[in-house]
Amino acid sequence: MSEVENSNTVDLQSQLLPLELIEKCIGSRIWIAMKNDKEFVGTLLGFDAYVNIFLKDVTEYEYTPEGLKTVKLDNILLNGNHVCLLVPGGEGPKVKA
């Protein structure tokens, strides 16, 4: 193999697949943006192959015409079909006081 070919070779063992990355986040805080106008920040307790997500100690953020509304929840189960973005360690949107 030439030096050029070798430098373009991808080391697959050092890469994480998406579900592996989510699995590494179990027990950690995660920020989740949904397809609607809601976002959630909580501690990831678990998920399944469909990326249905179970969180605890959750803050829900909803964008309304009046501004950003926040709600505290003990637990929530999110439908994976509506998940748009996952941010490991994310803190959620900045709330103006």
Curated annotation (Swiss-Prot):
* Alphabetical keyword list: mRNA processing, mRNA splicing, Nucleus, Ribonucleoprotein, RNA-binding, Spliceosome
Q: Name one GO biological process term.
A: mRNA splicing, via spliceosome
The entry's cellular-component GO terms read: Lsm1-7-Pat1 complex; nucleolus; sno(s)RNA-containing ribonucleoprotein complex; spliceosomal complex; U4/U6 x U5 tri-snRNP complex; U6 snRNP
Q: Return the InterPro entries for the record.
A: LSm5 (IPR033871), LSM_dom_sf (IPR010920), Sm (IPR047575), Sm_dom_euk/arc (IPR001163)
User: Under the GO molecular function aspect, what terms does this record hold?
Assistant: RNA binding
Residue span(s) of domain Sm:
17-92
Report the subcellular localization.
Nucleus
Where is the major localization of this protein? nucleus
Xref: SMART domains: Sm (SM00651)
Q: What does this protein do?
A: Plays a role in pre-mRNA splicing as component of the U4/U6-U5 tri-snRNP complex that is involved in spliceosome assembly, and as component of the precatalytic spliceosome (spliceosome B complex). The heptameric LSM2-8 complex binds specifically to the 3'-terminal U-tract of U6 snRNA.
The family classification in the record reads:
Belongs to the snRNP Sm proteins family.
Subunit (UniProt): Component of the precatalytic spliceosome (spliceosome B complex). Component of the U4/U6-U5 tri-snRNP complex, a building block of the precatalytic spliceosome (spliceosome B complex). LSM2, LSM3, LSM4, LSM5, LSM6, LSM7 and LSM8 form a heptameric, ring-shaped subcomplex (the LSM2-8 complex) that is part of the U4/U6-U5 tri-snRNP complex and the precatalytic spliceosome.
**Which named protein is this?**
Probable U6 snRNA-associated Sm-like protein LSm5
Q: Which organism is it from?
A: Dictyostelium discoideum
